[in-house]
Structures are given as structure tokens and as C-alpha cells.
Amino acid sequence: MRSDAIKKGHLKAPNRSLLRACGLKDEDFDKPFIGVANSYIDIIPGHYFLNNYAKIIKDEICKNGCVPFEFNTIGVDDGIAMGHEGMLYSLPSREIIANSIETVMNAHQLDALICIPNCDKITPGMLMGALRVNVPTIFVSGGPMASGVTKKGEKISLSSVFEAVGAYEAKKISEEEFKDIECSACPSGGSCSGMFTANSMNTLCEAMGIALEGNGTILALSKEREELLRKAARRICEIALDERFKIRNIITQKAVRNAMVVDMAMGGSSNTVLHMLAISREAGVALDIKDLNFISSKVAHIAKIAPSLNSVYMDDIHKAGGVSAVMAEISSRQGHILELDALTITGESLKERLKNAKIKDENIIRKVDNAYSKVGGLAILFGNLAEQGCVIKTAGIIGERKFKGKAVCFNSQDEAIKGIIKGKVQKGNVCVIRYEGPKGGPGMQEMLSPTSLLMGMGLGADVALITDGRFSGATRGLSVGHISPEAAEGGLIGLLKDGDEIEIDVDAYTIHANVSEEEIAKRKKEFALPQKEVSSRWLRMYQKLVSNASKGAVLDME
């Protein structure tokens, strides 16, 4: 056993003495030691109950002949961190989470790992850390919350509240309606109820085979979710010493491809691109941002979920057959785009896992021949504005897929929010928000507040927004993010001026500023990078080491 390094032989008597102080007995030193990586924190609605979930898992591990050791990671709630300096810390928290998993697991030489993530950066951070450790691993998330319901009977989610801010600013809803939306949107614990970043990543864990069926869709705080926890705990005990189930044997090239196929079919958050690039790097798997358009071109978009379709939420997907039904439909209709021989954590191939899966409600999960789109719900655009690529969630577009407009430039998200409220962005404009990339922020803030303001003010179908920052999974509209190279590293987005004409053609995968080469060269000579004081030592370190978004915004030591 890997854990023999801390428990076997007379030289390890001091180690055992410390473990005895934690309650271990003689017989425990012959059992596998299993790390239970929790992410319990009171301030995140998807995490405040995870202390109880960890207890369920630990009790089951003990019943099945292993010894659990719980430890915790930090967590940041992107919704609560939104709209102030706290958002600078969201993406960097992914690296801290990855480092903490690696540190605890390797410092104590634990044999296997079960991770309990749920929201935002916690799932990808745990995946990255687990891949570094490379022991048998299972992920079991806390689960999505139920959708909210207003007094009028309308189903809503957190994204509805962000958009209500814009509607209230524009005097389109009353104060009473505004309050009702605020108080109704998040009715329970769990990750926010739509296909936002948290649910996207928990769904992709299922697609990659590192989680059991239902991981992405079974509601939080339900009896069914508790049973999933117990199943995961029993399974980690069964495989704790089986090298076939080391996480790098599960998250392979095939698994990463399967994740991106499901991402396209379900219209996942644009953040998944950033995270899957980082995860594939830790797995030693090749994933180039340029490959994603090929996958998208081969995968129909068959499940549309809030915020793209505000009548459908994760619990609806679960009732309609879940992620397995989506994968089964894609595999039966779209050739060999899914790698069906990929190994899952149950020991089954993906093909075996899907053999009984079927769509139970074609109004929720469509057949391929009735898809929302013949291509996937994400696209990568290239052009002089994004030579290394940028990302758009095509599933969230509510207007035209081709757009031409005049730039209105802002050098920060805060500046953009003020400008939008003051009416500086009008129909037909392209709202440009720059110096918000991984280095420029630093931290690559999400632009949910500006996109939601535009949507709530009735401009969502008539304005494009481009940024070197990123978006919440709750964003919709013609919103292009992750522009690389970013402004802080000399990207063309930093040279744009108000009135420059910008063309976006989603179906041609292009984004272009209609500025002559001579004018660009002139602006480069005159350009001076705006100086931004960064008082945080951690953020200065992050700024110095982080790559741009086209590489996953990872800390690059090379």
C-alpha cells in the first residue's frame, strides 16, 4: 500500500503514534487509507451542507473496511464574489485548490481519494490536484439546487436575478417584482440550477467516467443524492488498491474528448474550455483549443438548459434521462464521435454504462434529428482580434450569429458597468471590456454583471460584448470571451478605439477588427500599457506566472 510509508515498520513508530492520537487502532494499520477531500464552507449555497455529506461518505468507508481521513479545500462563490474586487480571486482559487489536494495527499501518502466538490472553480481545481497525485479517485459532487419559482409561477434561477438588476435599472419591473425575483431564485442548497459552470463541470466528470451516473443532475439534499454518496464511498473502497483506476487511467485522451462532446451537446459554460485545457495539461493529454471547432461540427446541440432556455433546469434533465441519455443519443446517431471503449470508474466501458440509457422526455432532451442546432453549443473564433482564439457560448445567443458594429471601449469591468448604466452602449455597438484577462485583471474576472445589465435593459439581442476576461455560465447573448492574446500582453484588443468597426461571424468562426495594418502598426508604436497597482502579493505572483486563456490560464513555470 502507498500508505505503508507512514504506518509500517519500526521506523514508522512515531508516525503511528500520531495516528493513534487521531483514534486509530492496531487493526487500522492494515487497511487502505482514503483521503476525503471536502469543500465545505458556510458562505456557498452549494457547499454549506457538505460537512454532512462527508460524514455519510466516511461512515460508509468505515463500514467497507477502509480508513477515511477528511480534509478541506477553500472555496469561492462566484455569484457572491461578483461585481467587486473579490472576483479577482475566483480563478486563482483554482490553483490553490489544486495545490492543497496535491499537498495533503502526498504529504500523508494516502492510498485513494474521494472528492466532494460542487461549485465554480472547486471541481476543476480538485481534478487538477488529483491528477498530480494519480491514485484511484472518485468524484461525487454536492448536486444542483432546484429551480426557483416566482409568485407568478415562472421558473427562474440566479441568472434571472442578475438580469433583473438591468430590468430594474431600466424601470421595466417594479420594486416588488424585483424583490420577488431576488427572494425566489435560489430556493435551496446546491449548485445554481442551470447549466452554469458548476453543473457543467460536474456533468463533465460524469462524461469522463470519473463520477457515477447522476453526478451532474441528481438534486442536492435529496435521498437519491445521499445514496449516490454511499455508492461512491463503497466503490472507492473496492478500487482503493487497484492501479487500473488511478485517475490518469480514467482521464485519458478518450475521456477528455468525451467531455467536450457532452459539453457541445448540452451547451455548457464557456468556462469549461478554460478548465478542460488546464485539466488535460495535468493529465498529460493533448487538447488544443483549435480542436474544439472540429468536435463542435460533429455534435448536435440536443439539450438546452437555463440560461439558454429558461424553462429547463438540471432536475428536468435528470428526469428526462440525465447525462447518459444525452450520450446514448449522440452515440447512436452521430457515428464514432464518442469514445465508447473509454474506461469508467465502475469498471465498465462507456458503451456498457450507456446500454440501458434512453431519453424519457424528448421535449427536454431532443433527438439528433430534432436538435436545437446541428453543431455544438460552444465555438472558438479566430481573427486579428484573437490570433490565439476566443470562446463564445453559441447556445446562449439570442440574436443574430453574424454581427457588425462600432466599438465602445472600456478598460475595466467597473468602467463598463458605469458606462452601460449611463447609456454609453447603444443598439448596434460592440461593448469592449479589456485588461481583464488572466494577467491584466489579474485573475480574469467574469463579466456577468455587464452582460446581465445589457440583457435586462433590452439590449441583449442588439449588442455584442467582447472581452479578454471570461463569463459566468449564467451569461447569455452574443458574448465573446477569453480573447487571446489579451490586452496586457499586447493583444489587438488593447489597441482598439471607440468607433472601430468589429465583425463577428460565429458560423465562420471569425472575429475581426476592420482596422488597417498601417493603423495597427501606428497604434502599437504609440501604445503604453496602463499601469495598474496590485496590492495583493498572491495576485502579483499569479499575474507573473499565469498563461493566457488559450492555454487554460495555468501557472506556467517553464
From Swiss-Prot:
InterPro entries: Dihydro-acid_dehy_C (IPR042096), DihydroxyA_deHydtase (IPR004404), DiOHA_6PGluconate_deHydtase_CS (IPR020558), ILV_EDD_C (IPR056740), ILV_EDD_N (IPR000581), IlvD/EDD_N (IPR037237). Binds 1 [2Fe-2S] cluster per subunit. This cluster acts as a Lewis acid cofactor. Signal peptide: none annotated. [2Fe-2S] cluster binds at C119, C192. GO terms for molecular function: 2 iron, 2 sulfur cluster binding; dihydroxy-acid dehydratase activity; magnesium ion binding. One of its GO terms (biological process) is L-valine biosynthetic process. SUPFAM superfamilies: IlvD/EDD N-terminal domain-like (SSF143975), LeuD/IlvD-like (SSF52016). The active site is at S472 (proton acceptor). Pathway: Amino-acid biosynthesis; L-isoleucine biosynthesis; L-isoleucine from 2-oxobutanoate: step 3/4; Amino-acid biosynthesis; L-valine biosynthesis; L-valine from pyruvate: step 3/4. Keywords: 2Fe-2S, Amino-acid biosynthesis, Branched-chain amino acid biosynthesis, Iron, Iron-sulfur, Lyase, Magnesium, Metal-binding. GO terms for cellular component: cytosol. It is an enzyme of class 4 (lyase). Its EC number is 4.2.1.9. It holds the Pfam family ILVD_EDD_N. Its cofactor is [2Fe-2S] cluster; Mg(2+). Coiled coil: none annotated. Homodimer. Functions in the biosynthesis of branched-chain amino acids. Catalyzes the dehydration of (2R,3R)-2,3-dihydroxy-3-methylpentanoate (2,3-dihydroxy-3-methylvalerate) into 2-oxo-3-methylpentanoate (2-oxo-3-methylvalerate) and of (2R)-2,3-dihydroxy-3-methylbutanoate (2,3-dihydroxyisovalerate) into 2-oxo-3-methylbutanoate (2-oxoisovalerate), the penultimate precursor to L-isoleucine and L-valine, respectively. This is Dihydroxy-acid dehydratase.
